[in-house]
């Protein structure tokens, strides 16, 4: 490297801008940002407004409110009592067998078949085939359609099954799709299909033995839906028992304890109605009974706060006015003390049911 090169390499860099120019550039940047800040706020405001609009939009109601309504009406995610092996009913109730019934692809129902107590000794050690054949033994059969939440091992349901079994009835306790260990997702149409499938399966194996659909609370809507479809097919149900029925799901839902507290929120009732319509949750007992001819027994507790007695009375009036044979419709009101789930504790329940069915089936 020669001297000239050394000189060039050692020469200093060109002088930078004066300090005054740096301050001016910095201030210009701050000024631009300050001027843009209102625009940024405006954009943020528009984004928040758009998000709020989407939250209150119909599409979001369909995606959020409808599943919420499903959850509150069916409550099938609450699978109490917990830690129960539904495949082993003998741990909860005697002379009972567990089996599964395929309704359609992806839907398998868990069912407990309890034979009459008088056949308890015969049932010891027997398999499903024996229980199935026992449906022809002449003892009347009840297909039990429970209400929302829990499953077929719920304590109040087991108490009712025991009462009926002691009274000489076969009882098929059904968990709808999505309940207990049954697969699938609950919908009104799906639950109705489940009930029809179990009823027809039972009738195909019962010979001349009568089969009764017994619905409790939500199950009353399932029972009348199924009974109406079977009536239209020319195969009326042998008998129907409705325990704590409502008129329709719209009326029932606005008095449902988990929804009742929201009734005063502006627009809630309209949104609820839209959601029920959109999701086709109707369970129209008040319309269904107008098309039935099967013997119909309505049971209701005087102190039922979940489904008030007035709904049962209203349904009875509608049914009695619609039935040609008035003797086929009866309502029994139970005194205070049994509330919504405990009519099974009434000492008169069994005799009430047996007397009604015996008279209708004689």
Curated annotation (Swiss-Prot):
Annotated Pfam families: Hydrolase_4
InterPro entries referenced in this protein's UniProt entry, alphabetically: AB_hydrolase_fold, Hydrolase_4
Domain of life (superkingdom): Eukaryota
GO terms of biological process kind: monoacylglycerol catabolic process; phosphatidylserine catabolic process
UniProt keyword annotation of Hydrolase present: yes
Stretch forming the signal peptide: none
Any single GO CC term annotated in Swiss-Prot or TrEMBL for this entry: endoplasmic reticulum membrane
SUPFAM superfamilies associated with the record: alpha/beta-Hydrolases
Coiled-coil intervals, chain numbering: none
UniProt GO molecular function: lysophospholipase activity; monoacylglycerol lipase activity
EC number: 3.-.-.-
Keywords carried by this UniProt record: Hydrolase
Enzyme superclass (EC): hydrolase
PANTHER family: ALPHA/BETA HYDROLASE DOMAIN-CONTAINING PROTEIN, PROTEIN ABHD12B
Family membership noted in the UniProt record: Belongs to the serine esterase family.
Protein name (database record): Protein ABHD12B
Organism (species): Homo sapiens (Human)
